[in-house]
Each structure stands twice: as structure tokens, then as C-alpha cells.
Amino acid sequence: MIGNMKNLDIFDLRILTTLQRDSSLSQRQVADLVGMSQNACWRRMQALQAAGILVGSQARVDLAALGLELTIFVMIRTRHHARDWVDRFSRHVQNLPEVIDFHRIGGEWDYLLKVVTPGMAGYDRFYQRLIDGFEFDKVTGLFSMERILENRPADLNRLL
């Protein structure tokens, strides 16, 4: 069982895999699918939550169906790396509703944002707000032509 998170057993992995695929399942349904009693499953789910492994529960929304058809991966390079600049930039980006993922990355670029907008005009409005008040060395947008694989559950049995 849990204790040390490196000691996840097959039941813990089954619970996590099941919930990654469908977090709307009832506790009873999860227990049945992983082959445990409801009480034992509940205790393990509580332990996984307490350990910070099992976090939240979200429904996936098809943003394109809502008119947010353009997905852009925005890469940013800057020479500013002082903590106060990074904190200010981070707060700024987190207040831009078009940004659905935000990463500080290693390599040639410093930041990667995943952005959704209703179209090119929406992206231009977003871009103007993004750069307002900040100096960057380079900003580039990579436009997604097709979603081939998105939000795939991690194959925990093969990864751990």
C-alpha cells in the first residue's frame, strides 16, 4: 500500500488508472472495477489524496465545440531571470484566461504556454495583452493543425 509513494501496489495503480480514465465513477464502481471492497478502496483513495497523488476531479470540455477552435503553443525567450521579474510575469500569465497550460522549460526557450482562442483575431488580442509591460527576446506561436492525442492518461503500470 502507500506509506512511501514508491511502494504503490497493484491496487493503488488500478485505482489511479481507473480514475484517470473516468473520474466521475462512484466509489462503489471504482471498487468493483479494481477488485476491492468499497471500504478498502475508499481508504486507499483517501491515502492517495493525503499523499498528494490523487488531486482534484475534472470533466474534460471540448473547447472547440464551444468556439475556442484555435490552439497555439507559445514559446517565449527572455533574458530576465530575476525572481521578482519571474514572479510578476507568472502572475501576469496566470491572469490571461486564454492560457490553459504554463510551463517554465529548459533549453533554448524559457516558457511554453498552451493558449486557446476563437480564432486569429482572438490570438492577436491575447498576444497584445501578453507582451504588454514585458520585454522578451523572442516570442513565437506554433499553431495546432490537428489534435492527435490530448489528455491521455499516464500508463502507470508501464511508467512506474
Language-model features: where?
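A compositional/biophysical signature of low hydrophobicity enriched in polar/charged and small residues
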Residues: 1-160
